[in-house]
A protein has these predicted regions:
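Class II aminoacyl-tRNA synthetase catalytic cores and aaRS-like
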Residues: 1-395
Length: 395
């Protein structure tokens, strides 16, 4: 690196820099040798720019080095920014320009990587994790981490403007049992005793409120010794906050405005405030989930009172046990084949249900049901009406 200093990241140059001499450093994405001219895609965290090595533009020694370039070589290159001589590449931020190299230094050679360093890799996860340092070079992974960094920075700015103080709380502390087991760290100066890593800063932030700090914020690392699930990890980071002299609406208001600010700044998406609110019970009643996707149109419908008194044992037993009978109207699915319905039944069983009862309403208005013989025609008609069943629907 002696005598070299990077002047730009790869995508920091544009048509405004045409004619300028720049020094770039990064990884070779790919190299194409066309005989007297070599094209190289140079990559850093900002993106890709095309380099040209050509006899006459670079000395013979430099051109010889360029012939040896392979994927993931780390290089430093000096050259002049030019408008692309060939077709513009609209898929690249730097697609209108290229850098004609007049100097090259190979900073590190590379063996053939175990998988392509490219976006949306199809490589198996265990291989990617084995070579995690290579996986982290992939553009989609880098974008995720850069977005995370941006969100963290913007959160700190927003909360500071709202009067919050960022205060770090202890990592080595006594156990404060919450929803999982603690991770324990043995104490050197107190043999036989252990520190517990925090499951959350809950007690500390409450003490801060008692101490008069009024508004606290921390990008807090938390540790929970529990089984992995899609939304559970042994260590995770959360935006942790506490406020004094407020009610629940004040807390919701701050969080809504924070989310709206982040969506606008990071994704340029406008979030309409106030955000729609829903009680936990309403979410469970309508969607069967405490984190429903409101775009999902097939809401659960409670038809317990409609079927109360019918002789269908499944409904009757559920109601007598204090349960409910609920259904979904799958619009336009009345002609679904029996084989596919059977697959849905098995799917429901996988998640703890004993089965599914269905009503198919044909286009001619006739009804086919798995339990029709246990209900009168009037009971079936009232059930279809309660679920807004129309010709072509599957209930």
């Amino acid at each position: 690196m002696k005598g070299l200093k990077r002047t730009h990241r790869c995508t920091e140059i544009s048509t405004a820099n045409i004619g300028e001499t720049v020094t770039l450093m990064g990884w070779v994405q790919k190299s194409r040798n066309k005989g007297g001219i070599i094209f190289v895609d140079l990559r850093d965290r900002s993106g890709i720019v095309q380099l040209i090595f050509e006899n006459g533009s670079i000395d013979a020694k430099g051109f010889e080095k360029a012939t040896k370039l392979r994927s993931e070589f780390v290089i430093a290159v000096t050259g002049v920014v030019e408008a692309r001589s060939g077709a513009v590449n609209n898929n690249l931020k730097t697609g209108e320009i290229e850098v004609r190299a007049n100097g090259l230094r190979i900073l590190a050679e590379a063996e053939t990587p175990p998988f392509p360093i490219e976006e949306n890799s199809k490589t198996k996860e265990d291989l990617r994790l084995k070579y995690r340092f290579l996986d982290l070079r992939r553009p989609d992974i880098q974008r995720n981490l850069m977005m995370r960094s941006q969100v963290t920075t913007l959160t700190r700015q927003f909360m500071a403007n709202e009067g919050f103080l960022e205060i770090e709380t202890p990592m080595l502390t006594k156990s404060t049992p919450e929803g999982a087991r603690d991770y324990l760290v043995p104490s050197r100066i107190h043999p036989g005793n252990f520190y517990a890593l925090p499951q959350s800063p809950q007690l500390f932030k409450q003490l801060l409120m008692c101490s008069g700090y009024d508004r606290y914020i921390q990008i807090a690392r938390c540790f929970r010794d529990e089984d992995l699930r899609a939304d559970r990890q042994p260590e995770f980071t959360q935006i942790d906050m506490e406020l004094s002299f407020v009610d629940v609406d004040d807390v919701i208001d701050v969080n809504e405005r924070l989310l709206a600010y982040l969506f606008k700044q990071v994704l340029d998406v406008d979030v309409k405030l106030p955000i729609q609110r829903m009680t936990w019970q309403d979410a469970m009643d309508r969607f069967g989930s405490d984190k429903p996707d409101l775009r999902f149109g097939m809401e659960l419908q409670n038809v317990s009172e409609v079927v109360r008194g019918c002789e269908f044992a499944v409904f009757k037993n559920a109601l007598e046990a204090g349960g409910t009978v609920r259904g979904i109207n799958a619009k336009g699915q009345g002609s679904m084949p029996r084989k596919k319905i059977d697959k849905l039944v098995e799917f429901a069983k996988d998640y703890g249900a004993k089965g599914l009862a269905y009503i198919a309403i044909h286009e001619d208005g006739t009804v086919k049901s798995s339990f029709a013989k246990f209900m009168t025609e009037d009971e079936m008609s009232r059930l279809v009406e309660a679920m807004d069943g129309q010709a072509g629907d599957l209930l």
